Swiss-Prot record:
The protein, known as: Nickel import ATP-binding protein NikE
PANTHER family xrefs: D,D-DIPEPTIDE TRANSPORT ATP-BINDING PROTEIN DDPF-RELATED (PTHR43776:SF7), TRANSPORT ATP-BINDING PROTEIN (PTHR43776)
Localization annotation: Cell inner membrane
Protein species of origin: Rhodospirillum rubrum (strain ATCC 11170 / ATH 1.1.1 / DSM 467 / LMG 4362 / NCIMB 8255 / S1)
Coiled coil: none
Record membrane topology: Peripheral membrane protein
Record's catalysed reaction(s): Ni(2+)(out) + ATP + H2O = Ni(2+)(in) + ADP + phosphate + H(+)
Assembly description: The complex is composed of two ATP-binding proteins (NikD and NikE), two transmembrane proteins (NikB and NikC) and a solute-binding protein (NikA).
Binding site for ATP: G46, R47, S48, G49, S50, G51, K52, S53
Length: 277
């Protein structure tokens, strides 16, 4: 697998400003080195405040590292032209934890999915409509759902809409920032199985940002563990995961002993697909 997106010794600090002045800089990410390759699924695992979301924002180009570099297919983001940034925005997309907060509640589903098609592709009106309908079907919804408002959909359905929106420009990498954490166990399983199906169809890579080792074991091939802003461990995902670092083992002890499993899972309310294991 060829490298797709890399971080090399990336560090990030923040200061807070109050009425009494600026606070000392707090380092939230320290010399993180990560390589994401075509077609693989990598977990970024850590407790709250470990630096996971900061590293994800740097990889997405939403923030700049204080030190180190982020590169897409070997080209540092800091040297991108406007055209290269536009191509990068289409190639690397994100799905957020809060699906309702990630969409405009006044926009219908068709418009939500249509925004990246309008800004990141060269399709005409007819082409965008056809692509929108195909995306809805691809995530287990129907073209009729394009006329619905977000509040008319279940949580699982709306997360499918967010995935369809992220797929719209044909990305090579999806960053999933706690993207299934707000769903119940059965919906988590359905969403993971949907993402696996989409990966088989498209060959895209995933960066799965999470604190839940059970989902990592079900979904990912490789896991990177962060603690206090540092990468403390990196390992392939195995059926019986054995960690070395104390922070990794603490995460392992925190999960329930049973792994999620289902023989046959029905879809979320109003959904059209079922996941069968």
């Amino acid at each position: 697998m060829s490298p797709l997106l890399t971080a090399r010794a990336a560090s990030k600090s923040y200061r807070t400003v109050s009425l009494v002045g600026r606070s000392p800089a707090k380092t939230v990410l320290s010399e993180a080195t990560v390589t994401l390759s075509e077609g693989e699924t990598v977990a970024l695992l850590g407790r709250s405040g470990s630096g996971k979301s900061t590293l994800a924002r740097l990889l997405l180009g939403l923030e700049k590292p204080d030190h180190g570099t982020i590169a897409f297919r070997g080209r540092p983001l800091g040297g991108f032209s406007r055209a290269e940034w536009r191509a990068f925005r289409g190639a690397v997309q994100m799905v957020f934890q809060d699906s309702l907060g990630a969409v405009n509640p006044r926009h219908r589903v068709g418009r939500i999915i249509g925004e990246p098609l309008r800004h990141l592709t060269t399709l005409d009106d007819a082409g965008r409509a056809a692509r929108r309908d195909a995306l809805l079907r691809q995530v287990g919804l129907t073209p009729e759902d394009a006329d619905k408002l977000p509040q008319q959909m279940s949580g699982g359905q709306l997360q499918r809409v967010c995935i369809a929106r992220a797929l719209a420009p044909g990305p090579r990498l999806l960053v999933l920032d706690e993207a299934v954490s707000n769903l119940d166990l059965m919906l988590q399983i359905q969403m993971i199985d949907l993402l696996k199906d989409l990966q088989r169809q498209t060959g895209m890579a995933y960066l799965f940002v999470t604190h839940d080792l059970r989902l990592v074991e079900r979904f990912c091939q490789r896991v990177i563990v962060l603690d206090e802003g540092k990468i403390v461990e990196e390992a392939p995902v195995t059926g019986a995961q054995r960690f070395e670092h104390p922070a990794s083992r603490a995460l392992q002890r925190a999960i329930l002993p049973a792994r999620p499993a289902a023989a046959s899972v029905g879809d979320d309310e109003g959904g059209r697909r079922s996941a069968t294991r």
